Amino acid sequence: LIKKCPWIIKPNDIISITSKVHGTSGISADVLCKRQLKWKDKVAGWLTYVPDTAYDYLWSSRKVVKNQYYNKEVSEGYYGCDVWGEAHKVLQPFLTKGLTLYYEIIGWLPTGGAIQSMGGKAYDYGYDMPIWDPTTQTTPYKYNVHFGIRVYRITYTNPDGIVYEFSARQVQQWCKDKGLTPVTELYYGYAKDLYPDISVSE
């Protein structure tokens, strides 16, 4: 978009430039979800207000909800395993009501395959390939050992459905406060200061 429409960025705009990692996109949230009313709720609804929504956890790939409680037909998908569920386990303790995290999962899959590769070369980012342990009859799969998470976007949705977008700087600070890793920030500031030798009139 920027290459096609460079004029959309003005000299006094605040911009953020971050590094691109090769992984798979994930989303984790604690948001208001439709809940299935039990018969006693329906009876109580005749006498008083019974909310039909409640805060609950959701996790997904870029397009598919992976939480089986909200997507009954969900499959293991492209990778044949729920790598998004593994990432969500890491992030769930940091989710407060209304918060949604957008991130890239990098490294290895629970099955031992690379999340992303090209020309036979895995983009492992220094993480170890999970190996079958004959003693426990399992393949250990640990965060920051076999896979990593890079948060690049955060939103907060209030009870009225209004969405607040964290700034790029707020994303960096939030991750730092929680001990999580954001995408690497290469530049943050005024567009005109990125290349100070170029006049804004040119």
Predicted regions and their residues:
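Core nucleotide-handling region used for phosphoryl-transfer chemistry
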Residues: 1-202
